[in-house]
């Protein structure tokens, strides 16, 4: 049984494959596209109060960011759950609760 994330990755993969777009999806271009979409997400917040954003725009741009992240994971055969949990573990070591709780200080300045 596939996880929700695996289903999303497969749906994204199938969408691209049906259109023969895989030929354009090298790691560099996928990373650039992800960055562009992340900036479009930022644009949804530009010059607005946090409560005045258009949720539909945020939702669409966030979906684009996720889709490109999933495409990169698929391209390099990365297990999304595994890498996210590994990064959370690493961050927990860099930001122990007793030193970082309630602070925005970078780990090397704690």
Residue spans for each PLM region:
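Flexible "arm" and connector segments at domain edges
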Residues: 1-110
């Amino acid at each position: 049984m596939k996880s929700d994330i695996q289903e999303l990755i497969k749906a994204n993969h199938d969408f691209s494959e049906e259109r023969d777009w895989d030929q354009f999806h090298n790691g560099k271009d996928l990373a650039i596209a992800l960055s562009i979409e992340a900036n479009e997400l930022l644009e949804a917040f530009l010059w607005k109060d946090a409560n005045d954003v258009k949720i539909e725009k945020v939702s669409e741009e966030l979906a684009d960011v996720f889709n490109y992240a999933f495409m990169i994971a698929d391209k390099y055969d990365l297990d999304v759950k595994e890498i996210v949990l590994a990064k959370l573990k690493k961050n927990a070591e860099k930001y122990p609760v007793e030193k970082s709780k309630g602070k925005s200080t970078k780990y090397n300045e704690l």
